[in-house]
């Protein structure tokens, strides 16, 4: 099963983004899951006695979330019964965490276990993680 963003099939994502917030929907019972996924991560390798860091693409193309109940349903019912949608592409990790929590609170995922697989919300972010000078200059509500 593929990822969709704004109704379009996604096969590649611009490398300027670090990850995305997603919504997975079970078509059989309507339950949903909101989560986030990084597109790449850092690995280290010992080269000539020094640690070298490099980036490795994550498993985002085949990813179905970290929730065990959701993954169990995907195995039992098959990937064809689930839709994977990208809600928000994010440039920074802090922005990614912020928007994941924002969507989870917006949808009240903890109040409706019959509608959502999400069992907990974990976020720790600071204003500096999401606000940059460029972003502040774009805001029109600041005088």
Language-model region placement:
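Structure-specific nucleic-acid interaction/processing domains
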Residues: 1-143
């Amino acid at each position: 099963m593929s990822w969709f963003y704004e109704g379009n099939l996604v096969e590649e994502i611009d490398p300027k983004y670090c990850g995305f917030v997603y919504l997975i929907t079970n078509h059989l019972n309507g339950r949903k899951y909101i989560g986030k996924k990084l597109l790449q991560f850092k690995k280290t390798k010992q080269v000539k006695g020094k640690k070298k860091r490099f980036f490795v693409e994550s498993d985002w193309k085949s990813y179905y979330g970290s929730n065990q109940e959701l993954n169990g349903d995907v195995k039992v019912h098959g990937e064809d019964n689930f839709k994977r949608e990208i809600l928000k592409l994010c440039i920074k990790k802090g922005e990614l965490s912020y928007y994941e929590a924002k969507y989870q609170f917006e949808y009240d995922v903890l109040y409706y276990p019959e509608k959502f697989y999400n069992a907990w919300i974990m976020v720790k972010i600071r204003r500096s993680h999401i606000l940059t000078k460029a972003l502040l200059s774009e805001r029109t509500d600041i005088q």
